[in-house]
Amino acid sequence: ELPQALGTGVDVSEGALCVAKENRKRLGLEQRAELIQSDLFSADYFQKNSGNISLEYDMLISNPPYIPTEDIGKLMEEVRFHDPVLALDGREDGLYFYRRITEQAGKYLKPGGWLMYEIGCEQGADVSAIMQGEGFTEVTVKKDLAGLDRVVIGKKQMQEEQHV
């Protein structure tokens, strides 16, 4: 639908990247989708290019691990045994990765760019507060088809808004 769009996929899991590479090939996106193994923004790719204007994205979309550590044992077996713990464990309160990503996202978003998260159904207010605390505006929680909070969206301030 967006034939000029370019993307960079980042995951810490080698297995997840293998699946992403298969999907990229199947969809014919090899020239438009770059895939990087990294723990968030720690890869050399981001460190070497952190001042590079070409690394300013229009949007960052993340589905980070968001289940509190103590709740992982309570998950349905289909989830608990299908997904690796690495993909589920959001640490103590389930918000660890939202904090880490949000505090760094501004360095990689263009002014007016969007940060979007998938969230646990009870995390909308907390993730919204994290984003607002880092200066994101127009923060909105979107519901899924079941009527549960599922996505939080926020906008990086425009340059002139940041200096007011």
Question: What function would you assign to each model-found segment?
Answer:
Residues 66, 155-158:
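C-terminal beta-strand of the catalytic ATP-binding
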Residues 158-164:
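Flexible, glycine-/basic-rich loop-and-beta segments that form/coincide
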Residues 29, 83, 108-111:
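Helix-to-beta-strand junctions that scaffold the AdoMet/dcAdoMet cofactor pocket
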Residues 92-156:
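Conserved Class I SAM-dependent methyltransferase catalytic core
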Residues 66-96:
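Mobile active-site "lid"/loop adjacent to the S-adenosyl-L-methionine
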Residues 20, 63, 79, 101, ...:
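Residue-level signal for inorganic ion chemistry
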Residues 1-74:
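Conserved SAM/SAH cofactor-binding pocket of Class I
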